[in-house]
């Protein structure tokens, strides 16, 4: 049997998704989504001036995924000769964007632009791919009930520490915990912890670390009446929670959900905006 190592590309993006429970069960058919085959290539999708039920309106929703070997000529030689492609490098890019978004809830949520994504490099000796936050990741023009919000991101953290091993090594130093621990909830009181960790410890399950790319979430002026901000979450009284910039980090993949809305008004719903996942690895 002739079997040579090959790179298996992997990237997914969805602009809008979720489920609205009432008055009629609505599983959202995402208006824009992209996914790569294991051979790589490119996948793009875009929708404009869309409406989902009576809840969501958007000016545009788009996704992009691309996986390519960095040297076309050398990759072509592996197909026509005896050399193996595991000596080559590959890059996978993925992004998702929503523009002019309106979510009609108890407090109307609006955003001029939400964009998130990753750039991944194929694994080398460590076996871990480098996966860094795309430089165009941004929240722009965000407001709740007309009250403007400022969402400041800590992009540098998720660009510099682009592998899980780098992140774990850095986490053993007090300086890292002091500077970046908040973005990884290292000292937070969370379900499953009896008390907050004094030294700092990841919120982790099954080898996947939970964090946020949000450095600061604050009101530009007066706050929405009764709303509370805790880290990257806004809680709306008698309505629900809005999560900004959630990131999931494991040894071989990273996933970013730019916006998650768990609401019960005007009806129960979970919505996600600009969701991306990136990784890739060798077949053996």
Segments predicted by a language model, with ranges:
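Extended, solvent-exposed, non-transmembrane regions
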Residues: 1-284
